């Protein structure tokens, strides 16, 4: 069996539905991955865990402070997080959360060129764009907005194996020096997430999935 495909310069999209409907919906936009005003790095691998586990994980970053306190923005370690503003359409779910002015992490201040003792409003955004694409944004609102975009392309290989291509994009400090600082931090973090998800899948295989 063959499927309609479309290449957009970043991904190859496969339409698994009715072939005649493939032209009715364009693939989601990921223009920042190809935009010279953004710098992007990332990697890809197979995670021995089902697609649903990865989707659930990326839909809630409040656990980042527990997985890796060093990488987490300090505001995520608070006990009184602001509420999520959620919007739902027929094809996507998106949320945003605005944080009051607060400190940024030491690595953030380094690459963003911001004082560690400064207080900056911060905005978290996330969107389930398509079953195979999750996008997060984290913006620090200083003299100019400094934004990270985290793009997760997910390909189900089996019910227990998922291909994961992750990318981290930024609209500031576009040079190699910042990338040399950032890549080891995020590569180590996502490898840690991979190991945790694989451990969770192993537990599910043994004990079953608890919907509660």
Indicate residue ranges for each PLM-predicted region.
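Tryptophan-centered motif/residue detector
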Residues: 13-15, 38
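Short loop segments at secondary-structure junctions
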Residues: 10, 17-20
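C-terminal catalytic domain of Rieske-type non-heme iron oxygenases
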Residues: 20, 24-212
């Amino acid at each position: 069996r063959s499927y309609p495909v479309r290449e957009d310069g970043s991904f190859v999209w496969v339409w698994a539905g009715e072939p005649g409907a493939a032209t009715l919906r364009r693939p989601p936009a990921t223009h920042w991955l190809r935009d010279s005003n953004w710098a992007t790095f990332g990697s890809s691998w197979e995670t021995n865990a089902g697609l649903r586990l990865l989707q659930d994980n990326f839909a809630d970053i409040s656990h980042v402070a527990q997985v890796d306190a060093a990488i987490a923005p300090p505001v995520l370690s608070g006990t009184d997080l602001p509420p999520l503003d959620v919007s739902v359409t027929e094809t996507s779910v998106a949320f945003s959360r605005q944080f009051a002015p607060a400190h940024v992490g030491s690595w953030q201040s380094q690459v963003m060129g911001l004082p560690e003792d400064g207080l900056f409003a911060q905005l978290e955004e996330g969107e389930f764009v398509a079953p195979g694409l999750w996008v997060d944004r984290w913006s620090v609102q200083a003299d100019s907005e400094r934004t990270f975009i985290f793009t997760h392309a997910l390909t189900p290989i089996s019910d227990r194996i998922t291909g994961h291509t992750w990318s981290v994009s930024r609209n500031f400090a576009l040079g190699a020096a910042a990338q040399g600082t950032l890549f080891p931090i995020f590569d180590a973090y996502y490898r840690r997430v991979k190991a945790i998800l694989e451990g969770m899948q192993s537990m599910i295989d043994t004990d079953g999935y608890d919907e509660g």
